[in-house]
Every structure is written in C-alpha cells, then in structure tokens.
Amino acid sequence: MIDARFGHVNVIAKDWQKLADFYEAVFGMQIVPPLRDYRGPDLEAGTGIEGAALRGAHLRLPGLGPDGPTLEIYQYESGPAALPAAANRPGYQHIAFAVPDVPAAREAVFSAGGRKVGSIVTATTADGRRVTWTYVTDPEGNIIELQDWAERDE
C-alpha cells in the first residue's frame, strides 16, 4: 500500500472564473493563491495534449481547514464540447456537501445559477441512519449532492 493523502478533485470548466464564483458564493470556498496559468512542454507531456494551455484556481473545500484538499477548477484554451451530466454516466459523477438544511442549500444553488436534477429525498439507510439528500448542478451542469445526515434511529 502506498502512503497517500487526498489532494484535490478537478473540474474542467467552460468559464473557470464564473464557476469559482459560484462555489465561493454558495459553499463559502476560498481561492488558494496563486491563480494558475499553465502552458508549455511540461503541461503537454503531463496531460498528453498537444498545445495544452489552461488557467484556473484551487478552492479550499469547506470545513477541512487550511491544509485540507481543494477543488481544482481549470479551463483549457481549447477542447472538446462537454458531455451532458447524468447520474448514471460511468466515471467521476458528483461532489457531495454535508449541509444543515437541504432545501435551503438547494435554493442557494438555484439562486446562484445551478439547476435541479432530482427531488429531495429522505430515507433510512441499511445501518439505521436517516439522510436527506438531493442532486443539483452547478451552472455548468456538474452534479452536486446536498446531504444532511441525522443520528441513528434508536
């Protein structure tokens, strides 16, 4: 087993600044300086993309402290069209946030340009815990899960 620590999750955006603004406004994330502007042979070699050039930022994930993992939002200067988000598409699917009030958090997402994917659901899990959750999207269609876990039913 390797010695590892979680570092970041990457989202490729159509407009990195607008997407970063959304995550700052809705979830209170903060940009971790410096802003990134990468291009050249090292980026091309590492990504396997000829002529790769990107800009963006890392945003501190909420509730994890100054040395915690980040959400990395980058925008390539050119690239293929995005695939539509779908809850059953193979690969990385969504990012989840624990929130104290799912309906209020969902409204904050909508107010900042996000959209509805599904309904708000409350269910009891196999281990007896209750969770209220829903899927929404950010303004670029990336799926976000909002969840509120209750104590175990006694």
Model region roles, listed by residue range:
Residues 1-3, 87-88:
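Short, flexible turn/loop "capping" segments at secondary-structure junctions
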Residues 62, 74-76, 149:
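Generic beta-structure capping elements
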